C-alpha cells in the first residue's frame, strides 16, 4: 500500500499537529492522483479526508477500526504552478517563504517535496537558483552553532536502560524514555553561564511509536515557545534569549515519552 500521505493541499500549508498514526481508511480516502491538482469542489468529502485539519488526535482515532503508520508529505512548488513559464520569473517564492514552509513541514513531522520545474532549456531558471541558494544559507545559519554540549542535562524521570544522556549522544538508535507510567516529564539544561539560544530541535524514537502530544520550552522561568506533536522532528524557533536554565516540558504524551534527539542552537 501507499507509504506516504498527501498533506491535503499543494499550497505548502501544514497542520498544527501532524500525526503519522492515522485511521487506515485514509489510504483509500486519498488516492493522491485522483485528488491532487484538482479544485476542491466537495466531490471527495467523506468521513475522514486528507484535507481535514485533524486526522490523528485521540478524538479522531478513538473510533477507528484500524490504525496505520502513514507519515505526511507536504507538496508545493517554488513557482505559481508546476511547470516553467518565463512570465513567472518575477513570481518565484522568496527564501523567507521557502524557509517558513521548510520549518512548518520538515520541522513539524512531515517530509517536503518542493517542485522546481526546469526551463525550456532543461535548466533551473536563475531566479529559482537564487532563491534556493539563499534558502540553503538561511538553514545553515539556523543550525550553525549547536550549544547542547555546553549544558548539563537532567530529566525528572527515566528508565535505567534509557537515561536522558542518550537523547544527546548523537546516536540514531539510542534514546531517553520517561519512567513507566509517566505521560509528562521535564528536561532541564543548565549552562555554566548565560547562553544565547533561539532554537530547539526534538525527535522521538519512532520504532517505539509517536507519543508526544504537546510541550513547552521555558528560558529562565519565562515561556519561550509551545509545540504540539514531535514525531521524526520538531524544530522550535523563538526570539533569541540569553538563558542559563533551559527547560523542556512535555505536557502530554500517549504513553511514556521518548526522545532520540535533543539539540539546542544559538
Model-derived regions, located:
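Hydrophobic transmembrane signal anchors and adjacent membrane-proximal interface regions, especially
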Residues: 194, 227-229
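Extended extracellular/luminal ectodomain segments enriched in beta-structured repeat modules
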Residues: 184, 192-199, 243-244
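Short loop segments at secondary-structure junctions
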Residues: 194, 221-222
Amino acid at each position: 500500500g501507499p507509504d506516504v500521505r498527501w498533506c491535503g493541499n499543494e499550497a505548502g500549508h501544514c497542520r498544527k499537529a501532524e500525526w503519522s498514526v492515522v485511521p487506515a481508511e485514509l489510504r483509500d480516502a486519498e488516492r493522491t492522483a485522483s485528488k491532487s491538482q484538482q479544485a476542491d469542489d466537495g466531490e471527495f468529502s467523506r468521513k475522514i479526508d486528507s484535507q481535514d485539519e485533524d486526522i490523528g488526535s485521540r478524538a479522531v482515532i478513538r473510533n477507528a477500526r484500524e490504525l496505520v503508520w502513514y507519515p505526511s508529505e507536504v507538496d508545493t512548488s517554488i513557482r505559481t504552478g508546476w511547470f516553467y513559464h518565463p512570465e513567472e520569473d518575477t513570481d518565484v517564492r522568496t527564501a523567507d517563504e521557502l524557509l517558513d514552509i521548510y520549518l512548518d513541514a520538515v520541522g513539524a513531522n512531515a517530509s517536503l517535496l518542493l517542485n522546481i520545474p526546469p526551463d525550456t532549456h532543461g535548466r533551473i531558471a536563475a531566479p529559482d537558483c537564487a532563491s534556493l541558494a539563499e534558502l540553503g544559507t538561511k538553514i545553515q545559519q539556523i543550525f550553525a552553532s549547536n550549544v547542547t554540549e555546553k549544558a548539563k542535562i537532567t530529566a525528572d524521570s527515566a528508565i535505567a536502560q534509557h537515561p536522558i544522556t542518550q537523547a544527546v549522544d548523537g546516536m540514531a538508535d539510542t534514546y531517553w524514555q520517561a519512567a513507566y507510567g509517566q505521560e509528562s516529564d521535564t528536561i532541564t539544561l543548565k549552562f555554566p553561564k548565560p547562553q544565547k539560544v533561539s532554537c530547539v530541535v526534538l525527535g522521538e524514537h519512532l520504532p517505539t511509536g509517536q507519543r508526544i502530544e504537546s510541550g513547552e520550552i521555558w528560558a529562565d522561568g519565562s515561556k519561550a515557545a509551545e509545540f504540539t506533536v514531535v514525531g521524526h522532528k520538531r524544530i522550535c524557533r523563538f526570539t533569541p534569549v540569553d538563558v542559563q536554565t533551559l527547560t523542556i516540558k512535555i505536557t502530554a504524551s500517549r504513553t511514556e515519552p521518548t526522545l532520540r534527539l535533543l539539540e539546542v542552537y544559538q
